[in-house]
Amino acid sequence: MTSTPSKSRKSSKGSKAAKAAASAPETRPLAKTPPPFRNRVVDKKGLKQLVAWAYKHHGTAATSAMADQLKDLGFRYATQAAVSISVNDLKVPEAKQNLLGQAEELITATEESYRLGVITEVERHTKVIDTWTETNERLVDAVKKNFNQNDPLNSVWMMANSGARGNMSQVRQLVGMRGLMANPQGEIIDLPIRTNFREGLTVTEYVISSYGARKGLVDTALRTADSGYLTRRLVDVAQDVIVREDDCGTSRCILVKAEDGKYGNRLVGRLTADQVVGADGEVLAERNTEIDPPLSKRFEKAAVQAVSVRSPLTCEANRSVCRKCYGWALAHNELVDLGEAVGIIAAQSIGEPGTQLTMRTFHTGGVSTAETGVVRSKLEGTVEFGAKARVRPYRTPHGVNAQQAEVDFNLTIQPSGKGKPQKIEITNGSLLFVDNGQAIDADVTVAQIAAGAVKKSVEKATKDVICDLAGQVSYDPSIQPREVTDRQGNITHKAQRLGRMWVLAGDVYNLPPNARPVVTAGATVTEGQVLAEASQASEYGGAIRLREALGDSREVQIVTTAMTLRDFKLQGESTHAGEIWNLEAKDGTRYRLNTIPGSKIGSGEVVAELNDDRFRTQTGGLVRFAPGLAIKKARSAKNGYEVNKGGTLLWIPQETHEINKDISLLMITDGQWIEAGTEVVKDIFSQTAGIVTVTQKNDILREIIVRSGSFHLCTEKKALERFQGDGVMVNPGEPIAKGISTETMVYVQTVETPEGSGLLLRPVEEYTIPNEAQLPDLGHVKQPNGPHLGLKASQRLAFKDNELVKSVEGVELLRTQLMLETFDTTPQMTVDVEAVPDKRAKTIERLQLVILESILVRRDTISDSSHGSTHTELQVEDGQSIKAGEVIATTQILCKQEGVAQMPEATADEPVRRLIVERPEDTLTISTNSQPVVTVGQRIVDGEELAAGQPSDCCGEVEKVDSTSVTLRLGRPYMVSPDSLLHVRDGDLVQRGDGLALLVFERQKTGDIVQGLPRIEELLEARRPRESAILCKKPGTVEIKQGEDDENTTVTVIEADDAVSEYPILLGRNVMVSDSQQVTAGELLTDGPINPHELLECFFEDLRSRKPLMDAAQEAIAKLQHRLVTEVQNVYKSQGVSIDDKHIEVIVRQMTSKVRVEDAGDTTLLPGELIELRQVEDTNQAMSITGGAPAEFTPVLLGITKASLNTDSFISAASFQETTRVLTEAAIEGKSDWLRGLKENVIIGRLIPAGTGFSGFEEELKAEAGPHPDILAEDPAGYRRMQNLRPDYTVDMPAAPAGDATAVLDDPSDADMEATRSRHGIEAGSNFAAFARPDADNELKEEQVVDAEAVEGLQEEGLLSDE
């Protein structure tokens, strides 16, 4: 049975299948004719066609067997022929050296014209890259030719050529050249890899090569993730598109136009929407004809220009697509079944090739525009432009001056001799390389014809021009620089015209900031002469100290102010914590130094602190200020509070233990009296006796406080209330309660203990704080004109009134500190702390505080390139005393080589910072044989004539002309393009490596700047591009108005009803229309990416003025849909991926199915609501019947993410993104989910409504079968119906003998057969195909009633399936 294929399967693949189908008659008996014999090379494409043909004619089983045999065949012959690759198979073509040589020559020429300032840096770069790209292409051709002619059976060549593995670009890298690589930013490196993998790469090339390779790997890794996410979004948006109807009956359709008279695969698998009539009037197909490849070919033969077909885009089935609009299911080339989940198939078809797309965004700096549409002259003659010709000067990206046509016209070349003139059609935007009336030779490039009206969009890019030699800048007058002030008020200079900027050679010296030139402009200088001098002076004066030299500079210190503490001895002692320095006064008081000698301190910092134990407490406690004690308010308590006025400080000791452990470790109770040394918590002991207070929170012990004192039980309510809370100070002799009094001052508090309430009398310690710190006289040092220096003592309290000090150990209550005071205007002045021996007793060290002024003096430098030689002289000696403003050192800048000094004019705000010496080698005197033809001040480049027949061999400016010689000042020209930013002014001096200008150039935005996956995503998510093009809102005629300052342009469109709309064009935008051109709605007025939302709006607004709302919406959406489908297809096609249109259409249908309600009219809709177009249509129809006001709406385009979140099913939306938001909204709005899609059903665990779970599936089976009795219901022991038989081909059997239900039955007799036939109305001619009956084991056996013709007949009618 395998060889009798099923229902003729139609193949969308190759032409062979088509031929086979066409050659066989339509109603052929199966496989009676032998298959046609084909003898040709079967490469990858042929193999595809062969398998497709086998599948179409012979079904799956036969095809898979054949494929297996083909595989074995391939392996067998490959083994016999021993096809393998060795190094010797990689044959490098002979032509390679030659091609590389030509490229090198071209590039040398380009570099030369750059050096001569004929082209700009940008044009050079573009030209170099284009040259290499072209060389690479030519090399590929050479490789192909080499293999084809010399070694067609080469393993590498066969492999790549047959499509088994690899492609031409890989072969190119193996035996051609690796070519240009991009750096990680996507810019092309203009150093190509000239070698291939066979020859091996040099080190440089290897590094550049790995650049590109790394990028490829990273790309692939990112691509898989991106592509997966894209697929997920697509599945989510289209998962509920299921084929639910047979025919929606719509009259709408889409038009598929032939491209170059061919349809390719674009019609295959679609159904026609109208009659298709050929050019001669013959009807080729009726409505709803399935188009298979042969029919598509017939359309092409009959020259049908466009076919209207049904499409998912226009299908009117509710919430789904119907079979007729969808067409073939491409898996088995027949009309799609009901219940097929076409949405998911579409999503996967678009998402799966995602991994094959590139992620690249290339910034090529002008893509190779090498030889597009170049027209050469065929004869010698004179060029004539037509009468209506309009051209404007244009400079090509390679720096060639040409003219660009502004209108379409004809160019003729009138022959100089006999012959027919050559006519060339010039289109708008084409480039002309000849002038009107110019005489030209044959085979000269005349023009480059622009491809159609594709004005490529351009973007602005910049490139720096870097100076190659030091010298003086001089502009060509042609540049016409102008000042431009931007919004921030910065002034920049811009070139207005194309021109050269010269740098005339010379030795440029950078002067230090405070140097002044000592030579005059134009003076002749000799080597070693002083050009400029800089001096360094002291600000305050003082004693000089010279330090050793460090590196290339030397420090001179000037002691401005010094102060020695004569009354103190300085003593250092070492401890384990480092060195501690003490100051000891004559009376024995000691201060601890806070800094160490040799360090620097600032004003207000603490120098030393008094060592004083009088104010140290035993434990923590409470601070109380007695009246009279006052402190300064301080911003931060870090350094304590300064005492304003002395007095008494009261201290109530208490011991605080911070614990922060579990409560179970507590060993005492709250309120208990404990003795000193009691363990309160494991391993923590009390230092004093007293009453314990325990603080706890959440079963964690926070603190334990021990308050010492004497405790008295007390029942007197009044007394207890008086001392409640914080407690009260009680002076000696004051009564406290009955029987309780005190001799000293106490602090009384009420406490609760396990024994009962009582009063705790806590001891109070008194500390007397003096008004001023008692310190020896420190004195101040005052300078008449320098900074002052002094020390002052201050007392600082560590705590403020009522502060509780939580501590177990004691604390310092009062600190006495020595602080530094500089009374000076310079806050940043630092003071050095030094230890100096006493002048009288050398063994005793004293503390000295000095203020130093430090000056760095540069050493002599032997000529470094930019400063020239410098020579520095110190004017002072060690220990010398100087006054303020005296010079300490002078630096002289010496001339390196003799010459003539020049310098720019000095102005008040701009002192001279550079000067230039014009050396002998910067000029060149050339003797001429005849009178020179140049004038002084003229600028010459290589090749220009100095005198008759004497070209110059260098660039420069003419300085002197004699009758027999010319003196040139050498220089280097740089071409700058219009609108470039000039970084230097005319006459400025520049060093080598300085930036001269920033070239602003336009580079073609190639369509693939955003290509591959990011572009697909951009389209499907309907992203709004950043700088989108300006679109025309209404059709009309264009008028272009230039603004007065040449900057802003306005495009006005005069519409049909004489209304005028103005479109102001921003700076830097190119206008894409010309004057008096007719434009339609949605047409581009400027270049740039299109905003699809805006486009839809333009279409809708325009149509709405002419058509009813519903039609306008549908037509606007249809236009946008067509555009989206084409754009997406273009991306995939550019990568060589073929996807059937219908898949993209299913997705686009989902993106454009909604409209936004603008005005609800009398309907129940809400303004701003997104709703399906169909629903609004139904609602508005109801309104027109009842006479209510219909709803107004505008169509919207939703990106796939937005569309997924806006589906009717909230379960599906919530499972996609923003779960909480979707569910909350659904709950608030009380939404119901009708479970129409697949996802919803999967999530709640039901059968999905597609395939066999499709609700219409059962009914469809029954409807096909017609009414019939169920045999089993009549007679359980009789024959059963087999699955693959149509119900009406079932045999009724006589009942089994009553005794045995499982008896083996005899074959039915003729009479039985006759009876069954008559009962079911089956004509007598037809035999039964098959029947089944239970045998002894009650298992069904299938038997054939042998009648081959009947079987084939049934199969032909499609009533029997393969099995």
Curated annotation (Swiss-Prot):
InterPro entries: DNA-dir_RpoC2_beta_pp, DNA-dir_RpoC_beta_prime, RNA_pol_Rpb1_3, RNA_pol_Rpb1_3_sf, RNA_pol_Rpb1_4, RNA_pol_Rpb1_5, Rpb1_funnel_sf. Its EC number is 2.7.7.6. Gene3D superfamilies: 1.10.132.30, 1.10.150.390, 1.10.1790.20, 2.40.50.100, RNA polymerase Rpb1, domain 3. Residues 14-24 have a biased composition (Low complexity). One of its GO terms (molecular function) is zinc ion binding. Keywords: DNA-directed RNA polymerase, Metal-binding, Nucleotidyltransferase, Transcription, Transferase, Zinc. CDD domains: RNAP_beta'_C. Its cofactor is Zn(2+). Residues 1-39 are annotated as: Disordered. The keyword Protease does not apply. Pfam families: RNA_pol_Rpb1_3, RNA_pol_Rpb1_4, RNA_pol_Rpb1_5. It is an enzyme of class 2 (transferase). Zn(2+) binds at C248, C315, C322, C325. Binds 1 Zn(2+) ion per subunit. Transmembrane segments: none annotated. One of its GO terms (biological process) is DNA-templated transcription. It catalyses: RNA(n) + a ribonucleoside 5'-triphosphate = RNA(n+1) + diphosphate. DNA-dependent RNA polymerase catalyzes the transcription of DNA into RNA using the four ribonucleoside triphosphates as substrates. In cyanobacteria the RNAP catalytic core is composed of 2 alpha, 1 beta, 1 beta', 1 gamma and 1 omega subunit. When a sigma factor is associated with the core the holoenzyme is formed, which can initiate transcription. HAMAP family: RNApol_bact_RpoC2. This is DNA-directed RNA polymerase subunit beta'. It comes from Synechococcus sp. (strain WH7803). The lineage of its organism: Bacteria, Bacillati, Cyanobacteriota, Cyanophyceae, Synechococcales.
